[in-house]
UniProtKB/Swiss-Prot annotation:
InterPro entries: ATP_synth_OSCP/delta_N_sf, ATPase_OSCP/d_CS, ATPase_OSCP/dsu. This is ATP synthase subunit delta. Pfam families: OSCP. Keywords: ATP synthesis, Cell inner membrane, Cell membrane, CF(1), Hydrogen ion transport, Ion transport, Membrane, Transport. One of its GO terms (molecular function) is proton-transporting ATP synthase activity, rotational mechanism. The gene is atpH. The keyword Cell inner membrane applies. Gene3D superfamilies: N-terminal domain of the delta subunit of the F1F0-ATP synthase (1.10.520.20). GO terms for cellular component: plasma membrane; proton-transporting ATP synthase complex. It comes from Acidithiobacillus ferridurans. It is a peripheral membrane protein.
Amino acid sequence: MADLITVARPYAEALMGWRKRAARNRPGRMHCRRLPAMIADVQAQAFLTDPERRDAEKVSLLSAVPVAVDVKAWKAFLALLIHNDRWPATAEIGTLFADAMRRAEGVVDVLVTSAIALDAGQKTAVQSALERRFAGHKVRFREAVDAALIGGLVIHTGDLTIDASVRGQVQQLARTLRS
């Protein structure tokens, strides 16, 4: 997953740059939801991986997704994804782009996973730490429970993951011992 996020980052940044420069017909969240949904289709994947298909045919397929943006720029973006064989990362591109849009709007979505449910005091402490970390942004806090963490927290937002769990520390220790 980290590899796809690494691949996706420059494309998400390009979309965000396009969004900032365009006065109208700018890419939005819906564009980044529709494209991965289309690519998730088995027939679309077969078409996109078919070596007999030309890049122009693949771009034509993907540009069939209705979007209210500058069509020429959208097709150029799709052609870049196809030419560089980055179309499998569209879901990650969409996620990173949506995160960048929320940050530009002053909002950061954070998923906090813990081994057991956090009590009100712990939630408040984590919330304040996150607000300090993301100063100037409104932090939207979601919580999940994963007993496999044993203890501690894993904090995830966009392409940033902070693993302060017991499981993460044990895995790090195991990697160190193997080295």
